[in-house]
Structure formats: C-alpha cells, structure tokens
C-alpha cells in the first residue's frame, strides 16, 4: 500500500501506491494462490481504502482483519488522520475483527471513554473489536479487551515490557489473520495471537543502541 521512509527508530515519511496498483497486486495474488484471509494495516490514502473495500466486497468469502493504523509507534504520521478516519467507516462493516489501539479507537469514534468508543464501533457495523491497551498509562501491565457482537468476551493482562517495539501491532493482526485462515474462531485466534506476541516481544532485539526493539518472529 505504500513505500515508507523509516529505520529502527522512527518513520520519516511515505509515498502511497495508487489504487490501481493496489488492486493489481491483490488480483495477481488471488489469481495464483488459495487465499483465505486478508489483513490491512497502513493504507495511506482514502483511494486505497475505497479500493480495498471494493476488493473485499468482491470476495466476501475472505476473513478480514482491519488494523486501523494511523500513526506509527515511533510517532510518525502514516496519512492525514482526519481524512483517513472518515474513510475507515467503509471498511469497518467488512471486517471480521478490528484491532485498534486506544489512540486509534478514540480517533475513529471521537469518544474518550473506551467502553463508549468500543460500542460506537459496533454501531458503525463492527463484528468484533480487540482493544489494545499498550498506549494507556498502566506502567506495570498492558490490558487488551476482546468484544464480539457488542459483548465483552475476554481480556488479557500481561506485564509491560521495557522499551518501544517496532511492528508489534502489525504482527498481532497478521497472526490473527493467519489463525482465522486456518479456521479458528475470533476468540481462539486472538488467544493464540496474544500468547505468541508476548513470547516474541520478550525475545526482541535492538539493532542499534537507542532504537526500537524488533520482535523476534522466527
């Protein structure tokens, strides 16, 4: 969806692909491989969001994980936030699960209260929402909460690890998509993804002193 200018410490900028190129990439893969799930993260432009929505409506059989990325963990902007928020409305009803952090959840809904904001997503057509609490002011732990069809299904608390991590949200959403592709329910997929992510974060490596930690995924 985009070429980014970044290193292990921050995002400096990006150039989004055209919607035509995005759809060409998607159709090339679909014509070659037995796709079962789609995960999106940074989309960059409203045109790309609309193109993805068009593609997903053509393929309702695919599981879809929406990670509504607006800002990188390092603080770098990944698009015009106000414009992208309005466009994400088109993708929300198409997703099997949405995985916002609390900053993204508040931006998507315009509400500060997390419970009210989560319910607002369901009013917008969401099926399931995993609220990630890494940006909240809880120095000792991180709390994630899973909601399905408007109901609070489960939550996890894990010790807050020291440092900043590069790609943790992307890794979590991708793992969920992989488990959904294998036939897991949303609840089971999230459980496996959270367990796996905590393990790879504990083994994360720092390429350069002062940089973000990179999850050891393999």
Predicted feature descriptions by range:
Residues 81-153, 195:
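Conserved phosphate/ATP/ADP-binding segment of small-molecule kinases
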Residues 187-218:
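Charged C-terminal helix
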Residues 1-75, 218:
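Conserved N-terminal subdomain of the carbohydrate kinase-like
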Residues 35-37, 65-73, 99-106, 131, ...:
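Short beta-strands and strand-loop turn motifs
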Residues 152-154, 179-193:
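Phosphate-handling active-site elements
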Residues 152-166:
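Short pre-catalytic strand/loop immediately N-terminal to key active-site residues, enriched for Gly-Thr
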Residues 107, 163-186:
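Short, small-residue alpha-helix embedded
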